[in-house]
Design a protein with these regions (language model features):
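Glycan-recognition and catalytic cores of secretory/periplasmic carbohydrate-active enzymes
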Residues: 1-7, 12-21, 30-49, 57-370
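Intrinsic-disorder/low-complexity, polar/charged segments enriched in Ser/Thr/Lys/Arg/Asp/Glu/Gln
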Residues: 23-25
Length: 370
């Protein structure tokens, strides 16, 4: 109604190098009224309308989470956004073949999971950063997330929608270990080359399990350990299955401490090769957090004091990284350790991680304000 709700003075200008523009900051934090507003600056004009309220991020959150559903592989999906319908029938129902595991022409079920990208491949290492962050979101915001409705097919009855979506991926991950019970986990499941820009149901070339890698196996351990503790209230038997799979793969890694990359060979799809030090660290952290067993705590604390080897970025002796992604999950390990309520952590290491969390946060804030 054009009534003034708040007035003040902007500060600036401040040059932003990333966009090569001068910007002014309008701080209206004291405004506590909810509703739709606009800024009117004399000599400049009127801004677009914006909303102040408790639920302003709901649309962004639900849209992002619905995106995971639309990335599902092995089932029909359908959604509408801004009046446009997005849908495809079930795809990749022949996943996958074991030719590169020494069993030419043999097919083993590995349907499900999320497509990684437009090539529709499914990658264990890439799943790690995604599943890990989603479970951590549940750790921090369970009281809100358990009430969220994402309008999903009920593929895991009794689970909250948020966890149902994660379980679609963990169901697939449980199909990625070698069938010999060794605990080795295939690095990925893809075609030998990229598919091109086609709909997923038209991608009908054979897709293969690749050889195992230690990074994929360690990430599998971490994800299964997290699944075991977060899914236990909803399905204790499934949680135990996840934990046993994690134990088996962890034992294999302990018996084979050397880094193992998978052989890319005939494959031209994403390699996603990764040093495994951060992955093994994360595996130890999640196994300890889930079980409380001291051998996992010992493994974590021994690894946590070793200077990290990074895929890229500057070397550092700090415990927390500013830049992290699928190829560096070290922060996930550190956060699990520092936020745990379990007893027995090493006071000096705990203090070092806490201090580095704060100093890294301070640097990021300073960079944002620069």
């Amino acid at each position: 109604d054009d009534t003034v709700a708040y007035s003040g003075r902007a500060t600036g200008p401040k040059h932003q190098d990333d966009v090569d523009q001068d910007v002014w900051i309008a701080d209206f934090s004291p405004l506590r009224e909810k509703g739709r507003f606009y800024l009117d600056v004399p000599g400049v004009g009127r801004s677009v309308e914006f909303e102040i309220g408790d639920n302003v991020y709901d649309f962004a959150f639900t849209t992002a989470m619905r995106g995971f559903y639309l990335w599902r592989c092995g089932c029909p999906v359908e959604g509408t956004h801004n009046g446009i319908r997005y849908a495809h029938p079930a795809c990749h129902l022949d996943d996958g073949y074991e030719d590169y595991l020494g069993r030419e022409g043999h097919k083993r079920d590995a349907t499900g999971g999320w497509h990684d990208a437009g090539d529709y491949g499914k990658y264990t290492v890439n799943a790690g950063i995604t599943v890990g962050c989603l479970f951590m979101a549940w750790d921090h915001f369970q009281d809100k997330l358990q009430e969220v409705s994402l309008d999903l097919p009920d593929t895991a009855p009794g689970y909250p929608d948020f966890l149902q979506e994660i379980k679609w991926e963990t169901d697939w991950l449980l199909k990625m270990p070698y069938p010999d019970g060794s605990g080795r986990v295939s690095h990925k499941l893809t075609r030998t080359n990229f598919s091109g820009f086609i709909m997923p149901e038209n991608d009908d070339e054979k897709r293969y399990f690749t050889e195992w890698s230690s990074a994929a196996t360690a990430d599998f351990v971490a994800m299964m350990a997290m699944a075991a503790r977060h899914f236990k209230p909803y399905d204790a038997a499934y949680a135990e299955k996840c934990l046993e799979a994690a134990r088996t793969s962890y034992a294999f890694l302990k018996a084979h401490p050397e880094p193992q990359r998978f052989h890319q060979g005939d494959f031209r799809t994403g390699g996603y090769q990764s040093n495994d030090a951060d992955d093994r660290l994360w595996a130890a952290a999640e196994m300890w957090q889930t079980t409380g067993e001291p051998q996992y705590l010992k493994d974590f604390e021994e690894r946590a004091v070793v200077a990290p080897t990074r895929r890229w970025g500057p070397a550092t002796t700090g415990k927390i990284d500013e830049d992290w992604d699928w190829g560096n999950v070290r922060n996930l390990a550190m956060f699990t350790y520092v936020l745990s309520e379990r007893e027995g952590r090493a006071p000096e290491l705990l203090a070092a991680i806490r201090n580095d969390v704060l100093s890294t946060a301070d640097r990021l804030v300073a960079q944002a304000n620069d």
